[in-house]
Curated annotation (Swiss-Prot), chain A:
Mitochondrial membrane ATP synthase (F(1)F(0) ATP synthase or Complex V) produces ATP from ADP in the presence of a proton gradient across the membrane which is generated by electron transport complexes of the respiratory chain. F-type ATPases consist of two structural domains, F(1) - containing the extramembraneous catalytic core and F(0) - containing the membrane proton channel, linked together by a central stalk and a peripheral stalk. During catalysis, ATP synthesis in the catalytic domain of F(1) is coupled via a rotary mechanism of the central stalk subunits to proton translocation. Pfam families: ATP-synt_A. The keyword Ribosomal protein does not apply. Its main location: mitochondrion. It is a multi-pass membrane protein. This is ATP synthase subunit a. InterPro entries: ATP_synth_F0_asu, ATP_synth_F0_asu_AS, ATP_synth_F0_asu_bact/mt, F0_ATP_A_sf. Gene3D superfamilies: ATP synthase, F0 complex, subunit A.
UniProtKB/Swiss-Prot annotation, chain B:
Keywords: ATP synthesis, CF(0), Hydrogen ion transport, Ion transport, Membrane, Mitochondrion, Transport. GO terms for biological process: proton motive force-driven mitochondrial ATP synthesis; proton transmembrane transport. Pfam families: WRW. Belongs to the ATPase F chain family. PANTHER family: ATP SYNTHASE F CHAIN, MITOCHONDRIAL-RELATED, ATP SYNTHASE SUBUNIT F, MITOCHONDRIAL-RELATED. F-type ATPases have 2 components, CF(1) - the catalytic core - and CF(0) - the membrane proton channel. CF(0) seems to have nine subunits: a, b, c, d, e, f, g, F6 and 8 (or A6L). It comes from Drosophila melanogaster (Fruit fly). It is found in: Mitochondrion membrane. InterPro entries: F1F0-ATPsyn_F_prd. The gene is ATPsynF. Disulfide bonds: none annotated. This is Putative ATP synthase subunit f, mitochondrial. Transmembrane segments: none annotated. Mitochondrial membrane ATP synthase (F(1)F(0) ATP synthase or Complex V) produces ATP from ADP in the presence of a proton gradient across the membrane which is generated by electron transport complexes of the respiratory chain. F-type ATPases consist of two structural domains, F(1) - containing the extramembraneous catalytic core and F(0) - containing the membrane proton channel, linked together by a central stalk and a peripheral stalk. During catalysis, ATP synthesis in the catalytic domain of F(1) is coupled via a rotary mechanism of the central stalk subunits to proton translocation. GO terms for cellular component: mitochondrial membrane; mitochondrion; proton-transporting ATP synthase complex.
Length: 224, 107
């Protein structure tokens, strides 16, 4: 098999089974479970993350949000975060760098919001096609633009995440592959650059999972 | 033995409260005390049915969690243990692809 720049994104593993997708579920092993009454540091950290997200998403959902509807977005966030972050470690496959995964998260979510909104709040959905304060002459164009922007939402949501993950990994592999043909002095600089990039990519991993969750929260708050 | 049941060998009257970390089957020589020449025979005696393997993994996971994850002052170690284990796992299942990377310089 020919290896190339994109082989880090190849899900096929031994015997050509797509076993690399197993890394999607690594997060399940990472979620700290509770055994003792006194919480461990992991429990405290995990709980404070979840609580912060809960508060954040609750304000985004607004007063019309149903109780507990933040949970799905928190789960979405943690799934994507674990995938993004674990994917930065050597040899671990990054499922979120594939549209197959991100689109299967974004598309059903968006489709549910659309079905729910258009069936239950038709008037409200139509009203959303013309933003407040639009001059009368622009209204027909705004309807076109808003319709398009609404339809491409699952695509943009999925592509934003996937493109970010691919870009980061490509940058790291491209830079890393120049190492063998470098002098030792240059390799020191390369190492420092790679560490800096890795820190940057860790930030991107967290930010992108947050962006995905926040945007889907906002999309859901728009339909009711 | 159905899903979620206690192991068939577990008897509350003999063993007391159930301990998920403990193996209730017939005790064999501990692995650490097996002579090098007896390793083959020792491995041959292992029960390798999917049920037994799942049980062994489950007990090991339970013990690992109690040792590293559940303590109040648990550190960062379990995270890196899991990460290194995952890295090793994915390295091994991708080895047939990765071994070609040594030919990069000829590309």
């Amino acid at each position: 098999m020919m290896t190339n720049l994109f082989s880090v994104f190849d899900p096929s593993a031994i015997f050509n089974f797509s076993l690399n997708w197993l890394s999607t579920f690594l997060g399940l092993l990472m979620i700290p479970s509770i055994y003792w009454l006194m919480p461990s540091r992991y429990n405290i950290m995990w709980n404070s993350i979840l609580l912060t997200l809960h508060k954040e998403f609750k304000t985004l959902l607004g007063p019309s949000g149903h109780n507990g509807s933040t949970f799905i977005f928190i789960s979405l966030f943690s799934l994507i975060l674990f995938n993004n972050f674990m994917g930065l470690f050597p040899y671990i496959f990054t499922s979120t760098s594939h549209l197959t995964l991100t689109l299967s998260l974004a598309l059903p979510l968006w489709l549910c919001f659309m079905l729910y909104g258009w069936i239950n709040h038709t008037q409200h959905m139509f009203a959303h096609l013309v933003p407040q304060g639009t001059p009368a002459i622009l209204m027909p164009f705004m309807v076109c633009i808003e319709t398009i922007s609404n339809i491409i939402r699952p695509g943009t949501l999925a592509v934003r995440l996937t493109a970010n993950m691919i870009a980061g990994h490509l940058l790291l592999t491209l830079l890393g592959n120049t190492g063998p043909s470098m002098s030792y002095i240059l390799v020191t600089f390369l190492l420092m650059a790679q560490i800096a990039l890795l820190v940057l990519e860790s930030a991107v991993a967290m930010i992108q999972s947050y962006v995905f969750a926040v945007l889907s929260t906002l999309y859901s708050s728009e339909v009711n | 033995m159905a899903f979620g049941d206690y192991p068939a060998e577990y008897n509350p009257k003999v063993h007391g409260p159930y301990d998920p970390a403990r193996f209730y089957g017939k005790a064999d020589v501990p692995f650490g005390q097996v002579k090098l020449g007896e390793i083959g025979a020792w491995l041959g005696r292992r029960n390798k049915t999917p049920n037994a393997v799942a049980g062994a993994v489950s007990r090991a996971w339970w013990r690992w969690q109690h040792k590293y994850v559940f303590p109040k002052r648990a550190g960062i170690a379990p995270f890196f243990q899991l990460t290194v284990a995952s890295m090793t796992f994915f390295y091994l299942i991708n080895y047939t692809k990765l071994k070609h990377h040594r030919n990069y310089k000829y590309h």
